[in-house]
Amino acid sequence: MSKRKLNVALIGYQFMGKAHSNAYRQVARFFDDLEVEPVLKVICGRNEENVRKAAQKYGWEEYDTSWERVVERKDIDLVDVSVPGNMHAPIAIAAANAGKMVLCEKPLANTLAEARQMYEAVQKNKVPNALCHNYRFAPAVQLAKQLIDEGRIGKIYHFRG
């Protein structure tokens, strides 16, 4: 059975961009019954030399340095927002207003007001949207939570996640 192609634009190429690139390439190995096949269309970042290298290294067809240009592309179905949190709202809102599906890395927004604007944009435009919490259900994270809840590692004074 032929799978529907899902043309992906990834905004951000550094740590989370690398993780998301890998996930798109590996998803079919983990889920046999996917109805769609992600197509790595374009990766976007501010530094042209670095984003060009990322496109080659991670298997993207193209690269761009303007997220504004990318979200307006007619051939893009999904915009994956994997940049620092201060840029999530403007990119996600523009993508929703352009009729694109929106996948946003955590944190959703820097403020409640930004989060509400993002919510309103995806609702108004009736676009599918999701927030990534990649490691919430990872076995190591679940075990750490269990050990903390059971008090088995003592009092927590500092946590970085």
Predicted regions and their residues:
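N-terminal Rossmann-like dinucleotide-binding module
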Residues: 1-58
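Conserved G/P- and acidic residue-centered "switch" motifs that form tight phosphate/ATP-binding loops
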Residues: 12, 106, 151
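Alpha-helical structural signal in soluble globular domains
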Residues: 23, 27-30, 57, 93-94, ...
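Short loop/turn motifs at secondary-structure junctions
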Residues: 37-39, 59, 75, 152-155
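A contiguous active-site-proximal alpha/beta segment in oxidoreductase catalytic domains
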Residues: 109-161
